[in-house]
Amino acid sequence: MSRFYQVTRDNVTKLAELLTQESGITIRSALGAVDRVRKKFFLASEFYSLPPSGIQNEIAPRHGRIAGFLPSWNFPHEIVLQRIAETLFAGYPVVLKAPSETPLTYLSIAKLVDPYLPKGVFNVITSTGKTKHQ
């Protein structure tokens, strides 16, 4: 899981520029958001690799459960990505329906982390956002 940290560290500028283009926040804000997500990935990977400390805690995912995320286009990507990282580290697969207005940041993250995860563990779904009423 520390690969998430490495991947985001190696692509901070690229992700920040994409976030700026897509959601309209300043590059400075985007760099800060990506940096905070990167640090959360690092902290989560460190937490899950700590040796037991006398009190036995165990994270046991329940088979067949999937976490779904439906963020709005203007919801801070940073918060969504932190929750996704925590969910993946806890052992649950994730399905994220990217907002039709801002899918590129989520698709880029998925592309970066995909080589380090088993197939089907992190999924991003996109759509045009249009529905047809019958």
Task: Give short role names for the model-derived ranges.
Residues M1-N57:
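N-terminal Rossmann-like NAD(P)+-binding subdomain of aldehyde/semialdehyde dehydrogenases
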